[in-house]
Structures are given as C-alpha cells and as structure tokens.
C-alpha cells in the first residue's frame, strides 16, 4: 500500500499543536520540519496554542517544569541546564519570563537567557558587578526587539562632613550596546514590589499602594520605550488596604487578571481587564469569578509567594503549604476542585509561569 503524503498546510497545522519537547525530536526527521524552527510565523502560531506551566528554581539548584493537565494530573520534569556559574546565595537568584524566554539572575555575576525546550542558553554579563537585577523588557515601539534590564545600584551621598545617606540609583542595562544608562528619577523603588514584576509587551508591571496618603492599590509600570516609572491603573479593590492578599497575573497574553483574597473570610475573587493593556484607553475591570472558601488555602499563611494562571476557564494556583512545607497545585473550575501535592522533594525559592515555545535565544548561546 502506497504511503499517503499529507498536504503541507495540514502537516504544519498538526505540528503546531505538538509540545516543544516533541517537536525538537523531529528536527532530524525532515529538513522541512526543521525549517519551521526559524519560521517566525510558525513560531508565533505555536506560541498562541501553548498551555502555561510553572518553572521552578529549587534550593537544591535543580530546575523543574510542572505541566498541568486540565483533567487533574501533573507531570514534573527535571529540566537540564548548563549555566556559566552557580548562584552565590540562593536568596539573590531570580527567574522570570519575558516574551517566551527565561531570564535567570545570578547576583554579582550576570544573567542567563534560556529556552529550556530548545536547550539554548545565552549569557549577559555586565562589567559593574554592583548592578542589581529587577526585571527585563524592551522598547516595543521599535521593529527589532532589543532587550534591556532594569535595575539599580546601591549608592551613598554626603550630606555634610559627618553625615552621609544611602540611596538607590536606577539604571538600564542595554544588552545590544552593553552599556548602562542612568535614570534620573527620585526614589524610584519606593513602590518596588515584594513579588517579582510581570513583563508584558516589553514593559514591567507590579502591584503597589499609595501609603499612607490615599491607601489606594494600583498597578505601577516601568515603560522601556519612554524609560520612566508611572502608574498604569487603579485596582477594583483600591480602598481595601491591609485587608486583602492580592496576586497579579497575565490573562490571555495581553491582559491582566487579579486574584483578591479577603483575610477574614478567605473568599477569593478573580478580576480581569476588559481590553488589551497596550490600548490607550481607561482600564476597565470585570469580575471573572468567585471561588469557594472552604478548600483553598489562606494565601497570607503560605511560606512563599503564590502564583496562578487562568486557562480554559480553569484557575490553576501554585503555593507552598505552610504546615507541610510542600508545594501544592490547586485547580478550580466550576464545581471541580483538586489539590495536588508535589511529592518529588521540590522546595522552591523562585518560580514563574511560562509558555513553552520555539523562540530562539537572541544572544550568543550554546546547546545544553
């Protein structure tokens, strides 16, 4: 029986639905398939269909991906890596996602840029080792994506012959030019978050509150195009200072979702923004759902920051169980509730939500 050759359009459609770990194995099967990895249109099409997962950076210096099936099962994979160095102190190691790539900060050493599924690792090393990493973005107004790192230096200034004070000097490290650019702004990090910021469409966003003036919660942003800090929008719970636990997340790639848990009742509300965040319009929040209070943890009591994402009307939350010290995944959709404890000895100290993808590392890289 003669083999049947599928139309190329149909082949491509099938391949775009496969996870990156499967596609990577197929690179040697067919030159045409291998060419898809450098096809920007296909890479974007594949990314749109990606299901979010958690990437963990652990105390044992191992990294894991946590893939969640909506039926209520999870798959934990150790992710191989080969970085230039190891962290000096675990508390100064951060991992965050920016447009499909992972950026891992090594305090006083540099930043690794990584796609775990393509097994590519790049390295950014700045000459001044006193630069403290805060987040990654780029100028979205330019056609070419040139990454920039926002951070700061700990500085001192003399007030008199016998008195001096410390202050933060904000700066941007431009990866293309390998140069620092200082930002002239007073007290830039007064509103800096205790949770890692989100990188969306080139800019950084995080939760802040105006305390003690108005007690309003809002989203602060750093705009890499204008190179300024500025408020983005108020939150729907803007007057409830001190009575809620708030967690900000990305919704549908270009919108925000906000999880609000009341300290007293542990009731959880999920809000989402109506429009894309890059539109020049007033931000409108819509209540997306209310979650039951009996089974979900009190997020204020968890031993590390909680994180979550929404996929196919399912809330998937990750946090550490304060009593057992274990990492737990919670899944809520309609009447369905599942709590899954990860029993592989993972005690995380840094993690983020990540979309598996085929985006190549733009910096000098090597295969892991």
UniProtKB/Swiss-Prot annotation:
Pfam families: F-box, FBA_1. Residues 1-46 form the F-box domain. Signal peptide: none annotated. NCBIfam families: F_box_assoc_1. This is F-box protein At3g17710. It comes from Arabidopsis thaliana. The lineage of its organism: Eukaryota, Viridiplantae, Streptophyta, Embryophyta, Tracheophyta.
